[in-house]
């Protein structure tokens, strides 16, 4: 059997989190009544003229900076011509020959070590509307039409689904950390088209590529790529490669786990690109460039800092930088004086481990301040880890609350008063003089008995303090 390798390039569409659309002042809010966020511009009515949203340009520059790309201070918009019901103008305003960003890169972690994936270009464009199919008819919602997108086009540098997913997850984290998109995949704010081909290992030639459209979950992207590699490899082995693998667009059937032919893949010439006569070229001056290039700390830099400064395990650091909100919680807890190790345990293990499928960090009701206050009480010895779990359960049940008040109400405060603990310990030893003699004659297991008696009488003492005092008295 001939060994093959995959050749994978990805086109990612990121919907930007601007308040208004790219070429008009309509709202970009999600979930509104169909066709309510529309105007003559996004409806494509004759005579309506587009006006570029400056925030879109800024966000494109920010992404270009994050991927170490060239920011082209001169770029132009072009019309991409095609007919589809959700495209009222019969063309999409995009960029073609001169995009705003070019020649970037992302470093990803693979099983064989770090790898660079080259990014050919990032361009600004408007989104199309949405077709809704119901029975024998279809509806068109144009609320999404004219919503600002950045399309990020990689070079075909990935060789398997694992590398593709590593690239996508890295890009997904970056757009969220720099604040240009919420990248919500369920709402279609971060979606991917995968271009997949195969070739014999060692061959540098590029063979027929197939495009798989509109994938919006990491799991389905991986499955679609893996299926397509298997399909093309089987066609090659059977001698039917040229009949079965043609340049086309395919869809992934999530129920069956297979790709299905959708239409022949168009070449760029089929779209008849030409400069949009209604829009000026985009000129970026030095002031705007410098202003937009000030971006938040990137996930990779944050991870290095967490491992170096807080001695975190790499896996823990990777988890924290996978989501800006996780990193924000962690740093808020540190700012409250919680130890790094305690913060990771209570955020990544205790809190995340309790969140059910429909609950997220955003809507769970337990703020970073609440979780930090609880973790700090553990560090201070004012509550045991076991009792703190009960408090956390209560916070989740009631969607938040005052941590100290809950500790008091639930009677979970630990006694840290050394004098009070000494008195109780002495009382326990006095009342169990026979067992003290047995302990001193070698029955070490009785130490647990003394701890239990003291804890029972103290009703919530700090175990470490009780242990230390007992050791001192017995030894």
UniProtKB/Swiss-Prot annotation:
PANTHER family with a match to the protein in the record: GLUTAMYL-TRNA GLN AMIDOTRANSFERASE SUBUNIT B MITOCHONDRIAL AND PROKARYOTIC PET112-RELATED (PTHR11659), GLUTAMYL-TRNA(GLN) AMIDOTRANSFERASE SUBUNIT B, MITOCHONDRIAL (PTHR11659:SF0)
SUPFAM superfamilies per UniProt: GatB/YqeY motif (SSF89095), Glutamine synthetase/guanido kinase (SSF55931)
InterPro entries assigned to the protein according to its UniProt record, in alphabetical order: Asn/Gln-tRNA_amidoTrfase_suB/E, Asn/Gln-tRNA_Trfase_suB/E_cat, Asn/Gln_amidotransferase, Asn/Gln_tRNA_amidoTrase-B-like, GatB, GatB_C_1, GatB_Yqey_C_2, Gln-tRNA_amidoTrfase_suB_CS
Organism whose genome encodes this protein: Helicobacter pylori (strain HPAG1)
Assembly with partners or alone: Heterotrimer of A, B and C subunits.
Keywords on record: ATP-binding, Ligase, Nucleotide-binding, Protein biosynthesis
Keyword flag Ligase: yes
MF GO annotations: asparaginyl-tRNA synthase (glutamine-hydrolyzing) activity; ATP binding; glutaminyl-tRNA synthase (glutamine-hydrolyzing) activity
Catalysed transformations (reactions): L-glutamyl-tRNA(Gln) + L-glutamine + ATP + H2O = L-glutaminyl-tRNA(Gln) + L-glutamate + ADP + phosphate + H(+); L-aspartyl-tRNA(Asn) + L-glutamine + ATP + H2O = L-asparaginyl-tRNA(Asn) + L-glutamate + ADP + phosphate + 2 H(+)
NCBIfam families found in the cross-reference section: gatB, PRK05477.1-2, PRK05477.1-4
First-level EC class: ligase
Lineage, top ranks: Bacteria, Pseudomonadati, Campylobacterota, Epsilonproteobacteria, Campylobacterales
Stated role: Allows the formation of correctly charged Asn-tRNA(Asn) or Gln-tRNA(Gln) through the transamidation of misacylated Asp-tRNA(Asn) or Glu-tRNA(Gln) in organisms which lack either or both of asparaginyl-tRNA or glutaminyl-tRNA synthetases. The reaction takes place in the presence of glutamine and ATP through an activated phospho-Asp-tRNA(Asn) or phospho-Glu-tRNA(Gln).
Gene it is expressed from: gatB
The UniProt record lists the keyword Protein biosynthesis: yes
Protein name according to UniProt: Aspartyl/glutamyl-tRNA(Asn/Gln) amidotransferase subunit B
GO biological process assignments: glutaminyl-tRNAGln biosynthesis via transamidation; translation
Family stated for the protein in its record: Belongs to the GatB/GatE family. GatB subfamily.
Gene3D superfamilies the record matches: 1.10.10.410, GatB domain, N-terminal subdomain
EC number(s) reported in the record: 6.3.5.-
